[in-house]
């Protein structure tokens, strides 16, 4: 799947990429109050029709993703995992995918074996890609 200058392996609802997007990236420097406000704003953005896009790496980003999915809104998740043609997400992400609420994207040029822990550099790169796709560079 080609999105702008980026090429991805994709699993899930590919139509989500054509929706208005909102990147989610909870910064470490946020105070607890800033973090709470930012997370609330992300959920409100989803309620207003924007599809959240992020690697959803931090526990706070995962909380935002989980709330949005529980409310029935879609998300696009970037991952460093290799998405083969037989890949399927597990748990709640499997359910979200089966309901058309999820699109998983993996940059084709950087698949990482499942047993490899994601690095800070990879996290930063995935966040930058999410922000670029959402037009929030």
Model regions: which residues?
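Glycine-biased, small-residue-rich flexible motifs in mid-sequence functional cores and linkers
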Residues: 1-137
């Amino acid at each position: 799947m080609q999105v702008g200058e980026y090429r991805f392996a994709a699993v899930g609802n590919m139509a989500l990429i054509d929706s208005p997007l909102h990147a989610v990236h909870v910064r470490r420097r946020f105070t607890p109050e800033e973090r709470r406000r930012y997370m609330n704003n992300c959920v409100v953005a989803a309620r207003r029709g924007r599809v959240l896009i992020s690697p959803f790496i931090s526990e706070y980003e995962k909380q935002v993703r989980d709330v949005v999915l529980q409310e029935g809104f879609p998300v696009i998740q970037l991952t460093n995992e290799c998405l083969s043609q037989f890949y399927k997400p597990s748990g709640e992400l499997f359910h979200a995918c089966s309901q058309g609420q999820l699109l998983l994207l993996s940059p084709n040029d950087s698949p990482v074996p499942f047993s490899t822990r994601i690095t800070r550099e990879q996290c930063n790169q995935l966040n930058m890609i999410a922000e670029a796709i959402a037009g929030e560079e």
